[in-house]
């Protein structure tokens, strides 16, 4: 089997709370992308962490002892490849990404899986995060890069996810990934 280019992955879902639905630009499309990545994460055995903003400071949340133990266990295998989706692009997504980059991790910000109250904030935040060293990519691109090629056992499962979500992916891309 080919060696994966993305090692030690973990999916981070940032501040994706129902109470923000009315305020966030195209919230349902962010949720749809997060659901697709949750399904792929289950198929690919990628651990998932949900984060919320720490009200005292705009940083990655303070993990519970159980979550800290899980993260420490993952870190023992080397730096994480962190996949980020959620809201808001210029606040929680940015601060979480910067914290993870500073800790030495590789970060993949999923452009069709992030948004903000003001849609104009999104491309500015993504440009900044790219400049800081994050990989800004799409959910489909990430999934294909992770599985590598058709020889991997999970490839057919990911193809199925891609086909099942093709319409919602198209809509998210057309709305959230405008240049």
Task: Indicate where each model-derived feature is located.
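Conserved beta-strand edge residues that scaffold enzyme active sites
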Residues: 55, 114-115, 143
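Helix N-cap and loop-to-helix transition residues
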Residues: 5, 118, 138-139
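Short, flexible active-site-adjacent loop segments at beta-strand->alpha-helix junctions, enriched
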Residues: 17, 88, 140
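A contiguous pocket-lining binding segment that forms or flanks enzyme active sites
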Residues: 81-86, 90-133
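Generic beta-sheet signal
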Residues: 51, 110-112, 139
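Acidic carboxylate-rich catalytic motifs and surrounding loops in phosphoryl-/glycosyl-chemistry enzymes
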Residues: 139-146
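Active-site acidic carboxylates
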Residues: 1-65, 69-76, 98, 106, ...
């Amino acid at each position: 089997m080919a060696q994966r280019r993305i090692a030690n992955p973990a999916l981070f879902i940032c501040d994706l709370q129902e109470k923000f639905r009315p305020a966030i630009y195209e919230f349902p499309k962010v949720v749809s992308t997060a659901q697709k990545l949750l399904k792929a994460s289950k198929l690919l055995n990628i651990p998932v962490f949900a984060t919320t903003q720490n009200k005292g400071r705009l940083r990655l949340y303070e993990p519970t002892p159980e979550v800290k133990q899980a993260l420490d266990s993952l870190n023992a295998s080397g730096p994480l490849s962190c996949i980020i989706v959620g809201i808001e692009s210029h606040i929680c997504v940015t601060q979480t990404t910067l914290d993870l980059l500073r800790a030495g991790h590789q970060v993949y910000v999923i452009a069709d899986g992030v948004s903000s109250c003001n849609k104009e904030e999104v491309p500015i935040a993504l440009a900044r995060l790219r400049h800081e060293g994050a990989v800004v990519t799409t959910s489909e691109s990430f999934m294909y890069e992770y599985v590598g090629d058709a020889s991997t056992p999970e490839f057919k499962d990911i193809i199925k996810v891609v086909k099942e979500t093709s319409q919602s992916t198209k809509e998210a891309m057309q709305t959230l990934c405008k240049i």
